[in-house]
């Protein structure tokens, strides 16, 4: 349980950091790429919360991992179209790698209580 709480805390912190950055995107990118990034963040958060309480935890975690990869590309695109500074992209990439590792560790950890009772 400690792992899932840490990942939720870390992901929330990353989400807050990212939203503060997408708010600074120029108008055209804020209402296209910025919104897409924010929606992806909310989707991943929802999947992590569902994994925390679901019997099908790994299904939600695998899906969250895929969404995290899409988010990596969106963040990279933000850097490439020059709406996110290289330094900020570096921080985002490290944060996403850490979150991805935590998801992987959660997948490999012992089954959820619901799964153990089956």
Predicted segments, located by residue:
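Amphipathic alpha-helical assembly/interaction segments
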Residues: 1-118
């Amino acid at each position: 349980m400690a792992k899932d709480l840490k990942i939720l805390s870390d992901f929330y912190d990353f989400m807050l950091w990212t939203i503060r950055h997408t708010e600074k995107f120029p108008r055209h990118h804020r209402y296209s790429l910025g919104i897409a990034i924010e929606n992806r963040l909310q989707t991943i958060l929802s999947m992590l919360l569902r994994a925390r309480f679901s019997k099908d935890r790994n299904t939600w975690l695998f899906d969250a991992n895929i969404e995290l990869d899409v988010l990596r590309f969106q963040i990279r695109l933000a850097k490439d179209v020059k709406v996110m500074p290289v330094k900020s992209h570096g921080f985002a990439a490290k944060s996403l790698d850490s979150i991805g590792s935590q998801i992987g560790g959660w997948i490999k950890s012992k089954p959820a209580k619901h799964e153990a009772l089956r």
